[in-house]
């Protein structure tokens, strides 16, 4: 795997941090540290024990990712037409649980692609930096778009998740990573 693919892998593992950022109102510094720590730790553990669990994870990790992103897309589209209050991460326990749940894909990617990663230190550094960056982008983008149109935020977010999920499924079906 070339250095460019290692970089893309690291960034793609952390894109879901955007979700946490858009859901948090307070404790953003704590959230940024938590999201970075969870992604790096779970990715590193996945890389280290990938040989033991790789055969179990690699057969269905793309399907789980697709279903998760499809769920997020449908949830965003539901919020587009609904006037219900949006789920907020407003306490430490919710932040930690959501951060951990959304970091599990880092574990699966680390476990299933450990032999293709040639620049492990670089990948870990990029994950440590990009997870809080995407989280902060979600936080700031949500605040800016709500000022103008929260409906546009839901539509954009849903479409983004649908594209990512579809690409993951297409990649799996076509035999790619």
Regions found by a protein language model. Name each.
Residues 1-15, 59-68, 120-133:
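Structural signature of hydrophobic alpha-helical transmembrane segments
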Residues 6-26, 83, 94-117:
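Generic transmembrane alpha-helix signature in multi-pass membrane proteins
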Residues 12, 43, 47, 68-78, ...:
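Alpha-helical transmembrane segments of multi-pass membrane proteins
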Residues 17-29, 73-86, 135-150:
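C-terminal ends of transmembrane helices
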Residues 27-38, 88-96, 150-159:
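Cytoplasmic-side transmembrane-helix entry/capping segments in multi-pass membrane proteins
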Residues 28-55, 116-148:
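A small-residue-rich subset of transmembrane alpha-helices
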Residues 44-51, 104-115, 162-177:
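Hydrophobic alpha-helical transmembrane segments in multi-pass integral membrane proteins
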Residues 55-82, 149-177:
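Selective transmembrane alpha-helices of multi-pass membrane proteins
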């Amino acid at each position: 795997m070339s250095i460019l693919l290692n970089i893309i892998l690291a960034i793609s593992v952390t894109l879901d941090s955007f979700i946490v950022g858009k859901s948090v109102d307070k404790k953003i510094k704590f959230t940024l540290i938590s999201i970075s720590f969870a992604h790096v730790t779970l990715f590193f553990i996945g890389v280290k024990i990938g040989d033991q669990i790789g055969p179990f994870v690699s057969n269905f990790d793309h399907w789980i990712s697709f279903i998760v992103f499809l769920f997020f897309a449908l949830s965003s589209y539901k919020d587009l037409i609904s006037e219900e209050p949006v789920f907020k991460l407003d306490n430490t326990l919710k932040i930690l649980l959501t951060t951990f749940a959304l970091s599990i894909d880092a574990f699966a990617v680390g476990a299933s692609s450990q032999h293709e990663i040639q620049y492990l230190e670089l990948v870990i550094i990029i994950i440590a930096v990009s997870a809080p960056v995407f989280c902060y982008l979600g936080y700031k983008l949500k605040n800016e778009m709500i000022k103008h149109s929260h409906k546009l935020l839901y539509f954009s977010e849903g479409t983004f998740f649908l594209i990512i999920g579809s690409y993951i499924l297409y990649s799996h079906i076509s035999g790619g990573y």
